[in-house]
């Protein structure tokens, strides 16, 4: 009941008294008319659960009540609340403790379970009290009337002091009492009433003021909350704690008068201290990822739909997030000034599930100097040479292999009938005939462009889309040969996703940053089912061939001598990227169970100073990998809770290994002192992917062998063929008119050996610091 005194002008006071008198008369008339059966009398219903409460409020008010949407990491740690409109969590009647119901009834409507929506005794009492005091001491509104006001009246109507409004309220209250049970009315009221500080409903109030669930409330706390709806601003516990406690003491007295408390219980309750523990919002946990999830929710449910109390469980693991953030920040601090970069981004993907375990969009979300709120994992940037595996994947799908030969010789292309495009290697040198293994492992530009020219731009665009790259949606004629060397932008997230597909034996799994969504009533509305949505993007053989090149430390040693950040203590496949003008550095790599992508640069696209991916982004990638391997407690997120991670990559079935002549870039010799084993389909190819039959013979390593194992074809175009012949004259190779003229008798040559894996080390942070600081950050920053 209202017990707040407001001074009114005599005219307004008389008007209000007349209104109450009319209501009293109306109530008397209604009381002598035959009563309609209530819902409880005609068809007893069980107390409403949360779903029923939502259904009732929605049907009566015309819109679903907003609720707080919560976003969690994969282990159930709260990342963020979406509560722009206020905080509310709908609960069922049986979830509301008796002490809350008793305190509310004693305070607001002592005869709630006796009257039919209008408490005429309360109205008479209010009329008498107001007349005697010449102020409004009590309004006499029941809980049902208050609910009617909340559900059916506009904000302006709710505070209108008119006869018409009061009559309307009475009629609506009678309607509610006729068709709904007392439990349904009380449940709707306790979920809709405002408690101040953006807390709507009793569950939100318990959280906002005491950081508790309803079941954890004490009687003293319940009494305090019950007193707030009368005047939330006046009794605000944070601004006016003494007023709030005085109001609580009044509620305790009302509970005693209503028979809910004995005199001794009331006295003990008044003496019991009440400690406020304001709700602590999550501290900026994975903010770029949270915004990424919010965008997904808006796309799925609409701008208003995200305020429906969803419980959003995501794939992100705050331990991985803390680890990636720590290393990225340390690298920017360590090398940023030297190379003139100010920002870094990291994304970690689990290939089999499509889950995003970490998303570091910048090193500091709140740093305006680096535009920290921009998520650099989703912003398209030029990938540099990190895109080359996509080109090679398209080639391997079309009959090429790591042993296929391409000529690294000067070449130029005429574009648009005018411009000339002449690709160059970063060393400024040309290396003659190369197997694709050596060309990709050493990230040479000329072979990549020639390969793109050979297989066609449409083939690469098609393969890229299958692998997970969605950025390249322009008409095909908008793309040129610079596609092979990273001339077209792609987000780090999509590129890492493509690498994750390769890691998963060519099986594409859509990204599933959200694993499950439950609505405000706890019902599942979305469940990630990665295995049901997977598809074979490229063949397992093509994926393995790519992986074998990207994990070949020996093959890449010309451009990446050991030790480098690409050398890890376990077998990994990795590719770096450096763009023209030193604007973007990337390193993307994977194991069979983990893909990690790293970007280094400046958000404003300002050039760095002679920065290359292997020494800027590479150390972050390396240290993230090593830190994960060093901590078995992290393996559960990868699907290996038993603490044993698989080693290496799986050789596809129906394949054979064939030794082929091996040489390093620029060190060709016709004697072929060593051979390297390459993987082929069991049904060996009988022709070259270029279709070229003229060329030079090489020693064969096995019989049978595919032609590319023992044959060096001449380039097709006249200019390149002339350059190739000039190159060959100095090497004393035997020329033949057709590859069938070559002697395919096997020559025994020793096989090359891969260098041993290096012991674990950290390039950015020492192992000791990583072991302590990352876990401290995860526990302190994220409240684990």
Language-model segment annotations:
Residues 27, 33-48, 58-59, 72, ...:
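Soluble, non-transmembrane domains of envelope/secretory-pathway proteins that act on or interact
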Residues 294-297, 342-385, 390-394, 465, ...:
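Active-site beta-strand/loop architecture of penicillin-binding DD-peptidases
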Residues 54, 70, 78-89, 204, ...:
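Short pre-catalytic segments that frame enzyme active sites
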Residues 129-157, 215, 279-285, 400-460, ...:
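Conserved catalytic neighborhood of penicillin-recognizing serine enzymes
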Residues 273-279, 470-524, 531, 535-537, ...:
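Active-site-proximal helix/loop microenvironment
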Residues 33-39, 135-326, 451, 462-477, ...:
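Non-catalytic, structured segments within soluble enzyme domains
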Residues 2-72, 89, 111, 131:
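N-terminal type II signal-anchor transmembrane helix
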Residues 64-69, 73-77, 86-88, 96-102, ...:
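Extracytoplasmic
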């Amino acid at each position: 009941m209202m017990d707040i005194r407001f001074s009114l002008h005599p005219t307004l006071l008389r008007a209000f008294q007349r209104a109450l008198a009319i209501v009293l008369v109306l109530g008397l008339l209604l009381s002598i008319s035959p009563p309609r059966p209530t819902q409880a009398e005609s068809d007893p219903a069980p107390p409403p659960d949360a779903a029923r409460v939502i259904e009732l409020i929605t049907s009566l008010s015309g819109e679903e009540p907003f609720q707080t949407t919560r976003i969690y990491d994969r282990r159930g740690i709260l990342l963020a609340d979406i509560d722009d409109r206020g905080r509310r969590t709908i609960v069922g009647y049986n979830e509301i403790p008796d002490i809350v119901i008793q305190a509310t009834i004693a305070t607001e409507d002592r005869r709630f379970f006796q009257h039919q929506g209008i408490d005429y005794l309360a109205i008479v009492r209010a009329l008498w009290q107001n007349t005697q005091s010449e102020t409004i001491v009590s309004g006499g509104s029941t809980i049902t009337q208050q609910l009617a006001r909340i559900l059916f009246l506009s904000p302006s109507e709710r505070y209108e002091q008119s006869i018409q409004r009061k009559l309307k309220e009475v009629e609506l209250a009678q309607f509610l009492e006729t068709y709904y049970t007392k439990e349904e009315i009380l449940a709707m009221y306790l979920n809709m009433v405002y408690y101040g500080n953006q807390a709507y409903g009793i569950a939100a109030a318990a959280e906002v003021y005491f950081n508790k669930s309803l079941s954890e409330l004490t009687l003293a706390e319940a009494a305090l909350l019950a007193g707030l709806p009368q005047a939330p601003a006046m009794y605000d516990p944070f601004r006016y704690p003494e007023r709030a406690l005085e109001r609580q003491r009044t509620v305790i007295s009302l509970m005693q008068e209503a028979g809910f408390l004995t005199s001794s219980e009331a006295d003990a309750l008044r003496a019991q201290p009440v400690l406020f523990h304001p709700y602590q919002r999550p501290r900026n946990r994975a903010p770029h990822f949270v915004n990424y999830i919010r965008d997904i929710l808006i796309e799925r449910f609409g701008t208003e739909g995200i305020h429906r109390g969803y419980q959003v469980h995501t794939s992100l693991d705050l331990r991985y997030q803390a680890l990636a953030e720590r290393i990225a920040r340390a690298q920017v601090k360590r090398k940023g000034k030297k190379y003139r970069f100010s920002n870094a981004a990291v994304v970690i993907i689990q290939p089999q599930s499509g889950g995003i375990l970490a998303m570091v969009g910048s090193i500091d979300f709140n740093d305006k100097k680096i535009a920290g709120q921009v998520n650099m994992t989703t912003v398209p940037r030029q990938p540099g040479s990190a895109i080359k595996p996509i080109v090679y994947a398209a080639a391997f799908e079309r009959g090429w292999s790591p042993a296929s030969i391409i000529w690294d010789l000067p070449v130029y292309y005429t574009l648009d009938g005018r411009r000339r495009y002449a690709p160059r290697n970063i060393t400024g040198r040309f290396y003659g005939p190369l197997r694709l293994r050596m060309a990709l492992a050493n990230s040479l530009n000329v072979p990549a462009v020639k390969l793109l020219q050979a297989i066609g731009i449409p083939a690469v665009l098609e393969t890229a889309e299958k692998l997970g790259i969605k950025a390249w949606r322009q008409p095909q004629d908008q793309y040129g040969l610079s596609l092979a060397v990273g001339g077209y932008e792609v987000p780090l997230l999509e590129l890492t996703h493509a690498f994750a597909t390769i890691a998963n034996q060519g099986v594409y799994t859509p990204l599933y940053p959200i694993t499950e969504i439950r609505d405000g009533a706890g019902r599942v509305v979305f469940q990630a089912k990665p295995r049901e949505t997977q598809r074979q993007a490229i063949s397992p053989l093509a994926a393995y061939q790519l992986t074998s090149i990207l994990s070949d430390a020996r093959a890449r040693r010309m451009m990446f001598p050991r030790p480098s950040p690409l050398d890890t203590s376990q077998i990994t496949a990795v590719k770096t990227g450096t763009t023209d003008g030193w604007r973007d550095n990337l390193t993307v790599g994977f194991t069979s169970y983990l893909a990690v992508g790293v970007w280094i640069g400046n958000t404003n696209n300002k050039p760095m100073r002679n920065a290359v991916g292997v020494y800027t982004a590479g150390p972050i990638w390396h240290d993230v990998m090593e830190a994960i391997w060093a901590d078995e407690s992290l393996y559960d997120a990868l699907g290996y809770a038993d603490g044993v991670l698989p080693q290496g990559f799986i050789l596809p079935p129906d394949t054979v290994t064939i030794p082929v002549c091996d040489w390093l870039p620029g060190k060709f010799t016709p004697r072929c002192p060593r051979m390297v084993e390459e993987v082929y389909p069991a049904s060996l190819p009988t022709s070259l992917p270029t279709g070229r039959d003229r060329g030079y013979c090489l020693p064969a390593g096995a019989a049978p062998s595919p032609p590319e194992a023992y044959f060096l074809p001449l380039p097709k175009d006249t200019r390149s063929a002339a350059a190739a012949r000039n190159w060959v004259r100095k090497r004393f190779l035997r020329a033949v008119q057709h590859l069938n003229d070559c002697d395919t008798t096997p020559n025994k040559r020793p096989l090359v050996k891969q260098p041993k894996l290096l012991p674990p080390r950290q390039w950015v942070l020492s192992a000791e610091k990583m072991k302590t600081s990352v876990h401290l950050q995860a526990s302190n920053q994220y409240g684990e």
